[in-house]
């Protein structure tokens, strides 16, 4: 189960102007009810033991989305690594002649990789306007497919669980709005 927009649930002031939101009972901006709801939901799902797991799409940098090194985590099974996805797709879209100064986009994720249980994903949000095969650089189909093979190899060798959506792993040539 993938939960979108977790950051907007966690903060009372998320996307709001100053003075348009009310602090919690401790004076903070954390949404205590939403935090408790997410913890309870995740504990219940984990307790069922039927193989179901939860993925948080959380972009605010909240520490303790998964059970990693936190006394009071939200208990999601995985946190979707959106920063890795953005950097990865930018790198793959860069012409190979100009990638020399761009390798930090591939390695930066390792600086924070072990702070949470991350899931690397290339999901429907990433392919609304272009198919994966059209996002990689290359002058012809052979170059595109070579880049895709290299990209998949890098992704699968990178630590963390993986998630592909919408047939992009099979070289689907249509983007989401055409399906």
Question: What do these predicted regions represent?
Answer:
Residues 1-14, 55-56:
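Active-site groove signature of glycoside hydrolases
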Residues 17-177:
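Conserved alpha/beta catalytic core and glycan-binding cleft of carbohydrate-active enzymes
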